[in-house]
Amino acid sequence: MSMKPCPETFPYPLIALDETDSTNRYISQLCNELQESVAELTTVTAEFQTAGKGQRGNTWEAERGKNLLFSFVLHPTFLEARRQFILSQIVSLSIKEELDRWSDEITIKWPNDIYWRDKKICGILIENDLSGHFIGRSISGIGININQNEFHSDAPNPVSLKQITGQEHDRYEILSHILKRVQIYYNGLQTEDSGTYTAEITARYARSLFRRRGFHPYEDAGGKFSARLLRVEQDGRFVLEDENGKEREYLFKEVQYII
């Protein structure tokens, strides 16, 4: 697999590939081979992925050379395993806040898809390796639709930044901005001593959620229902209130939005 040209001034360790099966798999293998010598925020990008995956095992459609397909690694050994959802929050917030530069209609669909209106612009898959009661390694795999004009898969609701704005965008510039935002959030987590920074992240995440107001349709193992969002717990549990006033609490993959 060949390397793609990338800016000489890119501010983070970067491996730019033309094609790979999965950037998550690539960087995971790299970490296994090199262990601690893989620096924080080392990033692998690809112009095309042959087996990119999403949260539910879905493939991610991305036209070659048009989008951002990348994975980066963190070593959050200071974070207890029970707090791992905070990593999902800072990654999704970093992407959402970068895309906010072009639209005020960007939201986070729990747990960490990024939406513009009712359309998906970004998918995120985070894989954490635990070391005892702490997180030894966290790899975030991300696909963002940037400059793609048309989508041909059976994905129901994709959209790209170009479709939103009508113009082409510099993918490396967007990537560097996202990583900088992640770094700022991550450094804040490393240095906090009272939990106030975590609380601020949780509050920002709550304000950014898709369909955070009003009643909307959902589906769980028992069927379809209408509910409103109450809160997302710090461990990532999704809490809804249905039309009968009953609270319903869900872990990942236990409930789906009906779009």
Question: Where on the chain are the PLM-derived regions?
Answer:
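Long, positively charged amphipathic alpha-helical accessory segments at protein N-termini or as interdomain linkers
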Residues: 9-10, 25, 77-106, 116-259
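N-terminal lobe of the biotin/lipoate ligase/transferase fold
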Residues: 1-101, 122
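Short loop/edge segments at beta-strand edges and connector loops
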Residues: 18, 108-110
